[in-house]
């Protein structure tokens, strides 16, 4: 890596997902607004709180809801059946 290309605030930051109780130490320039947290190694790091991450997002955890697409398609067809039938009669 080239020397002296990173901003002054490039440091190790703790990204912590409180809903999954999991965190990652990553070098970043992310603003932490003065929040810190003691990590498992006993050191205190700037803290960037996450609302969701790959540890808590339903798509990554496999707990997503399946949308009933058949029901939605049939509702669409019922609503626009008259429009479609008049369109077919005109041709």
Curated annotation (Swiss-Prot):
One example of a Gene Ontology biological process annotation: translation
UniProt KW Ribonucleoprotein keyword: yes
Pfam families the UniProt entry points to: Ribosomal_L31 (PF01197)
One Gene Ontology MF term: structural constituent of ribosome
Disulphide connectivity of cysteines: none
Top-level lineage group: Bacteria
The entry's keywords: Ribonucleoprotein, Ribosomal protein
One of the record's GO cellular component terms: ribonucleoprotein complex
Matching PROSITE patterns: RIBOSOMAL_L31
Keyword Transmembrane part of the UniProt annotation: no
Quaternary state and interactors: Part of the 50S ribosomal subunit.
Family: Belongs to the bacterial ribosomal protein bL31 family. Type B subfamily.
Name of protein: Large ribosomal subunit protein bL31B
Protein's organism: Neisseria gonorrhoeae (strain NCCP11945)
């Amino acid at each position: 890596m080239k020397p002296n290309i990173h901003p002054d605030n490039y440091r190790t930051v703790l990204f912590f997902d409180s809903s999954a109780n999991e965190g990652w130490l990553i070098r970043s320039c992310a603003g932490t607004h003065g929040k810190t947290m003691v990590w498992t190694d006993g050191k205190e790091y700037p803290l960037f709180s996450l609302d969701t991450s790959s540890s808590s997002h339903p798509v990554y955890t496999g707990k997503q809801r399946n949308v009933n697409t058949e029901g939605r398609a049939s509702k669409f067809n019922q609503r626009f059946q008259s429009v479609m039938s008049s369109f077919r009669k005109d041709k």
